[in-house]
């Protein structure tokens, strides 16, 4: 689990819900995910996508941000938003991981999946509305072109004049390139280089607090101006998608993480021969508790990770209470 998400998950586990209706609601979701390999895999795949989406949505406000930076951030937000919607749409329609023969990764036939939980039914209905949104359909059409405009910017070429003492005295921005530069190596020196290979090692930026070279200040200003001009068509196109927002997925991230972890746990223990069953919730105040085969789940996890996991039922003994 990402360190930044440990707090919410810890609170959820240390202060468990006691409302029977909510518990049943969540167990329905867990049943659906455990019973559908493709849907649970979709949820796992969504975690890093939503993490990236959150990064581009919750960025700090910068008064000095250029139009180029604002445009790139918004475009990346829409890119990850579209990926979330497409993944969910494929999963709910039974086509997640669909192969050429029409089957999905777990061998089952593609087709709309059967859901029991109200939560996932509502999420499917929401996904259906999002995919039918004309703005979203236009986004899918325009997104490859808009991303290509940004992604092709890989490098800039700078020309530097030297004075009589061979010190840099003047600089000019020459080109914006579609290939990244690389440093030189022995192999490059032996076979020759193309225009993107340097004649010395490639150096990374040092952000250790050193002041910028005065020569670089106007150069960076020119670079910002060029970049702003480059993304002007993209910025204009993005105004069409102002109604699209991925915050709903960011709000779901902690819930998705919880269910992903729960599904992994159930499947892990089941694969080692340990039962995991849905409890029957007694009404509040009933004062009854009955269980058969109760076992120490911490021991089961630790022993189950050993090479001889198949022998787990004989090593972790359950008790009836």
What are these regions (language model features)?
Residues 1-165:
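Conserved amphipathic alpha-helical "coupling/scaffold" segments
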Residues 58, 86, 90-93, 163, ...:
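Charged/polar positions within long, soluble alpha-helices
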Residues 67-70, 74, 220, 227, ...:
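Amphipathic alpha-helical coiled-coil segments and their boundaries
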Residues 74-77, 230, 248, 252-255:
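Amphipathic alpha-helix face/heptad-repeat signature
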Residues 150-216:
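Structured, charged N-terminal subsegments at the starts of enzyme catalytic cores
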Residues 208-239:
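Extended, charged coiled-coil "arm/hinge" scaffolds of SMC/Rad50-like chromosome-maintenance ATPases
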Residues 255-321:
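Conserved NTPase motor "head" modules and their coupling/switch loops across ABC/AAA+ ATPases, GTPases
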């Amino acid at each position: 689990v990402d360190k930044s998400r440990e707090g919410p998950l810890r609170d959820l586990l240390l202060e468990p819900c006691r409302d029977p209706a909510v518990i049943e609601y969540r167990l329905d979701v867990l049943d659906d995910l455990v019973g559908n390999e493709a849907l649970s895999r979709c949820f796992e795949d969504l975690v890093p996508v939503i993490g990236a989406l959150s990064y581009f949505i919750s960025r700090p406000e910068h008064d000095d941000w250029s139009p180029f930076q604002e445009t790139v951030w918004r475009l990346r937000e829409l890119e990850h938003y579209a990926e979330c919607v497409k993944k969910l749409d494929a999963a709910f329609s039974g086509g997640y991981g669909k192969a050429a023969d029409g089957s999905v990764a777990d061998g089952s036939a593609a087709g709309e999946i059967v859901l029991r939980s109200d939560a996932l039914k509502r999420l499917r209905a929401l996904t259906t509305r999002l995919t039918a949104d004309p703005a979203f359909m236009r986004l899918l059409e325009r997104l490859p072109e808009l991303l290509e405009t940004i992604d092709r910017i890989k490098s800039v070429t700078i020309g530097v004049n030297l004075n009589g003492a061979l010190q840099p005295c003047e600089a000019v921005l020459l080109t914006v390139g579609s290939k990244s530069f690389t440093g030189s190596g022995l192999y490059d020196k032996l076979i020759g280089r193309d225009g993107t290979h340097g004649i010395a090692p490639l150096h990374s930026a040092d952000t250790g607090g050193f002041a910028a070279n005065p020569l670089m200040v106007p150069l960076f200003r020119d670079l910002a101006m060029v970049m702003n001009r480059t993304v002007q068509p993209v910025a204009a196109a993005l105004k069409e998608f102002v109604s699209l927002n991925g915050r709903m997925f960011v709000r779901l991230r902690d819930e998705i993480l919880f269910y992903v972890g729960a599904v992994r746990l159930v499947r892990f223990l089941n694969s080692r021969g340990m039962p995991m069953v849905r409890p029957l919730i007694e009404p509040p105040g009933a004062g009854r508790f009955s269980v058969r085969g109760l076992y120490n789940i911490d021991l089961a996890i630790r022993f189950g990770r050993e090479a001889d996991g198949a022998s787990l039922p004989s090593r972790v003994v359950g008790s009836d209470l």
